[in-house]
Amino acid sequence: MPGFAQLEDREIAEILSFVRSSWGNQGSSIDAGQVKKLRQRIEAGNGPATTFVSPRLADMLAAPNAEQVVRGMRLHLETRELLPANVGNQLNCTSCHLNAGTVADGSPFVGVSAFFPSYAPRAGKVIGLEERINGCFRRSMNGKPLPPDSADMQAMVAYFDWMKNNTRPQDKVAGRGVGKVDPALKPDPENGRKVYARQCAVCHGENGEGLRNSAGEMLFPPLWGDESFNIGAGMARTFTAAAFVKHNMPIGFQERFPLGQGGLSDQDAVDVAEYFSHQPRPDFPDKIKDWPKDKRPLDARY
């Protein structure tokens, strides 16, 4: 989903007209002239200033390998459905990489492939993008790795490469990762339990089980239990999870593009991350191989 400022007046008018005439709505159509006048009166992005640019996903259709890139995007959005033999829980890539990896501070894919191969402290060696993706399959999705040369792995890499655009290895990409949170804060899991009940349970369930629709399909992912990420996942670390929560959760309560995400204080984010990251979840047997050379982070679960 592109940033609001990237859309033409005509495109915004078409979107608004569609919404106003769909799902039982009976509003009149909006034309480009009306949008132009309104844009002159308001700042398109009057939230926090950022140089992060969300790619226009429709543009991938012009890529010479468009079919492969689209397959890669679908694999990130529908991972469990398309790769059931490799996903061992109820998560998809987009559970952590929001909006198919297009959200600033939501672990976006924008520019990422330019930085691989790179040294990974947890692995203690230089790894390629395929190995990094398989780390997510084994940890965040508690599943099995894809063969690096398989068509599906190469489709996922192709999607990353398309998202790279003109990024160079030496560049700094705004919005990369999950943002920052004050690392000096002391977690209070009891307050975290209260924050979870107040801000998170409505989507992720009172017992962290996630939320399904009437057809049994998972709408919001489970945060603990057998169907969630294992202890080897980055999201099982308090301060990694806290930074993600701080910048991306809850959704729908703010004006931040594109999901209305964020709003918790640093302390509440740290507390709720401490609470849910330490709930029961699957083990990761290969944890004994992690950080063979570098210092283990203090918030690691093992």
Where does each model-flagged region fall?
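Generic structural signal for alpha-helix termini and adjacent loop/cap motifs
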Residues: S21-N25, E78-L82, R139, M163-N166, ...
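Juxtamembrane/interfacial segments around transmembrane helices
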Residues: G143-P145, F244-G252
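Sequence/structural segment immediately N-terminal to covalent heme-attachment motifs in c-type
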Residues: P64-A100, P183-F220, T238
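Conserved helix-loop functional segments at active or binding sites
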Residues: P169, G205-E209, I251
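Flexible coil segments in periplasmic/lumen-exposed cytochrome c-class electron-transfer proteins
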Residues: P2-A66, V70, Q90-L91, F116-A123, ...
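Active-site rim elements
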Residues: F253-G263
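Gly/Gly-Pro-rich "capping" loops immediately C-terminal to redox-active cysteine motifs
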Residues: M1-D9, P84-R132, G210-K246
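Short acidic, low-complexity segments enriched in Ser/Thr/Gly/Pro
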Residues: R132, C136-F137, D171
